[in-house]
Amino acid sequence: MRKITGIIVHCTATHQDWWNGKTTSAKVSEVKKWHTRDRGWSDIGYHFLIDRDGTVAKGRPIERDGAHVSGHNKGTIGVSLFGGQGSSADDNFSDNFTSAQDASLHDLIDRLQSTYGPVPVTGHNEYAAKACPGFRVGAWLADGESEKATGFADIIAAFLSLFRR
């Protein structure tokens, strides 16, 4: 089993009603096509994907390094939320995602940290000049939607959130 050192949150950058009515499995298959056919990767880049209704789907096997943040895939788990098209890194979670996704993401993080220990949880936007996942993960973890922290404050907030659960 590989050593897990962190969880990195992403978004698929799809419109809120993208493939509305399609199954989560069909959506995951489409993302896998984007990653394998269009980018030439060996598999889908994310380990987990969370649909708009809160359904959590498995992607790449967790035993294998992902393909979700250049230079930071080794030891990390990639989790992607469906949605986020047109988002900003300074948006609130609820600006782009559903309450069902919120609950599922919290639950998945709790389960992963129960298995792998209190590893840091960060957003793609902390490693690259991107909006993804469309909110500040540290602020979301620390106190939901009440403030928008940036940079170092996100890291401190994420660290402190480990002791609040």
Segment roles from a protein language model:
Residues 43-45, 118:
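Short secondary-structure junction motifs
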Residues 31-32:
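Charge-rich, low-complexity N-terminal segments
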Residues 39:
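Aromatic-lined glycan-binding groove of carbohydrate-active enzymes
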Residues 1-21, 25-26, 52-165:
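Basic/polar, cationic surfaces and motifs that engage anionic cell-wall
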